[in-house]
Amino acid sequence: MLKVTTSRPWVCSRCVRRQVQSRRRLATASTQYRESRPVPVDNSAPGAKRDDRTLRQIFDSPNFWAEFSQSSKQSYNRPAVGLFQNRYLVNPQGFEVFANTSLRKAQRIVDKVLSASTVEEYRHVARELDRLSDLLCRVIDLSDFVRATHPNAAIQAAASRAYAKMFEYMNILNTTTGLDKQLEIAMATPEIVAGWTEEEVVVADILRKDFAKSAIDLPRAQRERFVALSQEISEIGPEFVDYMTPAKPYLTFESSKLKGMDPVLVRQYTTWGQTKIPTIGGAAAAAIRSVQNEDVRKEIFMATRTASRNTVYKLEELMRKRAELAKLSRYESYSHLALGDKMAKSPASVSQFLEALSKDNNQIVEGEVSELLKFKMSNSHGSSPGLQPWDKDYYMSQILASVRSHSRNSDFLSAYFSLGTVMQGLSRLFTRLYGVRLAPHETMPGETWNSDVRRLDVISETDGHVAVLYCDLFSRPGKSPNPAHFTLRCSREITTPELEEASSLSQNGLFKTNEEAANDGMATSRASGVLKQLPTIALICDFVTMSGKSSRPALLSFNEVQTLFHEMGHAIHSILGRTSLQNVSGTRCATDFAELPSVLMEHFAADPSVLSLFARHYETDQPLPYEMVAEKLALDKRFEGSDTENQIILSMLDLAYHSDLPLSPSFSSTQIYHSLQQKHGALPVDPPGTCWQGFFGHLFGYGSTYYSYLFDRVLARRIWQVVFKDGEAGGSIQRDNGEKMKEEVLKWGGGRDPWKCLAGVLDDGRVENGDEKAMAIVGSWGVKE
C-alpha cells in the first residue's frame, strides 16, 4: 500500500491536542536555579555572522523586512517562478499540469515494475516503488498544504483538484494486484536482496507490510468488502470528529450564581440577568475552574462530560467497522493491525508500557489528590465530603492562583523573547549541536503564498545547502491558529535515469537544466557528487504582532517559545534525516517515534545554557534572569501527575476500543471508560450518566497510537538525562552530545529500527530488541523530572 506523508495520523500532537481538551503543559527542565553565563556565539563559518544578524532583523524589524523583501523582488526583474520555486505552479492552471505530468511519470514506473522479469530489473523494484511514492507525495502533500493555506480561492480550488486526482490514483494502485507480487518476488530472491542498500531493504519491508494491511491478497469479494469498509471508515470518522455534540448544548443560570467567574466573561453570555453558557468550549471550562457554587460546578461538569446519544453511536460504529476491517485482514484486532510496524509492535507491549508508567506515576497523583483535598477542607464550608470530579480543576486553579500571586508576573518573560531572538537562538543551538545554521534567503516573485512568509536556507558546515524552510509565523485574519510543521518535499536521491527522463521537460523551455526539471524546479544539492532533492518544509505559527506602525517586535510567551522549539524539533528531523529514499526520510518513521525530536526540543527551550544563547530584553539587551523561568516551570509542573494519569487512561481507552471488544453484542464504550478510570486512576471517577468518550476525537486520527506522545515524552526525558546530562555543565550545547543524537537517531529518519537508534544513543543494550520487556523498561523510566 502506497502512502503519502500527510496520511500519518498526526503531525504535531502537542498542538493538535489543544483543540479537544485543555491540557496542562509539561514542564521539561529542572526548576532548580542554575546560574549560567552568556555563551559566546560561533561566527567562524563564512557568512555566519551576517546570517545571524539578519535572521533576527527579518523577524523583529518591520522596516528591515520591508527593505529585504522588496529588494529581492526588484533584483530579479523576471516573471513569477511558481510556489516554492515549483515551475508548474505560477498560476491555478499549473496545478493540473503538475498533477498530469506526475501522473504520467507514475504510470511509466508502474508499467516498468509490472513488466520486470530479469534479476537486473527486479533489483530496481524497491527504488522504483519508492520513487512512485515520491511522485504521489510531491503532488498530494504540496496540494494539501496549499488548499488549506493559500489566500487565493482559485489556487485553493486548483490545489484541491490536483490533490483529488492523485489521491484517487493512489487508491487505484492500492487495490490493484501486481505491484505486491513483484515486490514479493524481489524480496524472495537472495541474489537481489544482497545487492540492495540498507535503506532499500527497509523500504521494501515497509511496502510489503503496507500491502499486507491493504488486504490486496484477499479473494475478490473480500477485497471489495475491505474497500467498502475503508470508505465507510473514512466517512464516519470525520463525521464523528466534526459533528460531535453534547447532550445539553447550553445551560442557563442566574448570573448571581456564577460568583467567582470572570465578570467580563459572564457578561458576554448574559441577557436580562440570565447567563446562557455553552457546555463545550472555553466558557464552561472557565466556570468549572472558578465558580464558587459547588452545585453549579457539578451541573456544568456533568454537561461537559456527557456527549449526545448520536455522537456515542457514531463512535461505537467507527470502532465496530475498524474491528471488522482488522478481522477481514486476518488480524486479531485493529490494534494488532495498526501496531505491527510501530516501536510497540503489539497491544501487549503498549499495555506493559502504560502499566509500568502508571505505577511510576501513581504515588505522584495520590500526593496531588491529598493536597487538593486538604485545600478543600480548609477553604470550604458545607460542601460535599471528599474530592469530587467537579472539584479537581476548581481547587487546582485556587492553589495555582495563590502561588502565582507570590511570584513575578510571567508576562515579564515575554520581553526577553522577541521572535527574532528566538529564531536566532535556534540557529545558534543547531550550529553548536549539529553544525547547521539558518540563513535568510531572498525570495523570488511568486515563491511564497503571503508577503509575511520568510524563507530560510539551512546551511551545513560540511554539506552546504541542505534544506529550505518557509516560515509563516505571524497571525492574520483567516489563518489557522494551530502551529504545525509540514514536509512539502522529502529528501531523496535523484538517479541518472531520472535526469535522462527529465531532458524532454528541460527542452520545452520551462526548465533550464535536466537537474531543475527532475525536481520540478525546487531545491536540489549535489554534495559528494550525489544529486538529491532537498527537504522543503513549511512552519506555521500564529504569533501576534503589534498593530499600526509600532516598531516593537513580536514578543512570545514562554509557552510560545516552547511551541516554536517543538515545531523546530520536527524540522531538524527532516533536515538531518536526508536519506536516499523518500519513504524513510526525516519524520517518515514509526508513529510512536516521530514526536521524540520535537518533545526533546522542549527540554532545550527551558535550559539555562540554551537560553543564554539568545534570551535578552528587546529594549535593554539585558540577559534573562533564569529564576523567572524557574518560577514559571515550577508553576506548570505543579499538577503534572494528574495530567499524566489522564493521558495514560486515554491511551488505555484507545487500546481497549481497538481490541476485539467492539464485535461483542454487549459492547459499551461508556462502561469500558468508567471501568478503566476506576481500575487505574487515583483521581475522582466520572459519575454515572456521563459519557465523555464521545468527545475523544483523536480516536479517529490516532487509532491505537494515542500512547505515542506519552511514550516519546519518556524517551525524550531519558535522552535529555543521559546524552545531554540534564543540561549540567553546558551539556545541552556541546557538539559531542549533538553528534551522538544526530548519528544514532536523527540522520536515519525512518531507515533504521528505532529501538536500535534508542539503544545506540543511550548506550543501553537492554532495549535493543524492542520486546515487551523493553517496553516495560521504558515505562519504568517515567516522565517526572
From Swiss-Prot:
GO terms for biological process: peptide metabolic process; protein processing involved in protein targeting to mitochondrion. Keywords: Hydrolase, Metal-binding, Metalloprotease, Mitochondrion, Protease, Transit peptide, Zinc. It is found in: Mitochondrion matrix. SUPFAM superfamilies: Metalloproteases ('zincins'), catalytic domain. It catalyses: Release of an N-terminal octapeptide as second stage of processing of some proteins imported into the mitochondrion. InterPro entries: M3A_MIP, MetalloPept_cat_dom_sf, Neurolysin/TOP_dom2, Pept_M3A_M3B, Pept_M3A_M3B_dom. Residues 26-51 are annotated as: Disordered. Pfam families: Peptidase_M3. Cleaves proteins, imported into the mitochondrion, to their mature size. While most mitochondrial precursor proteins are processed to the mature form in one step by mitochondrial processing peptidase (MPP), the sequential cleavage by MIP of an octapeptide after initial processing by MPP is a required step for a subgroup of nuclear-encoded precursor proteins destined for the matrix or the inner membrane. Transmembrane segments: none annotated. Its cofactor is Zn(2+). The keyword Membrane does not apply. Binds 1 zinc ion. This is Mitochondrial intermediate peptidase. The lineage of its organism: Eukaryota, Fungi, Dikarya, Ascomycota, Pezizomycotina. CDD domains: M3A_MIP. Its EC number is 3.4.24.59. GO terms for molecular function: metal ion binding; metalloendopeptidase activity. Zn(2+) binds at H566, H570, H573. The keyword Protein transport does not apply.
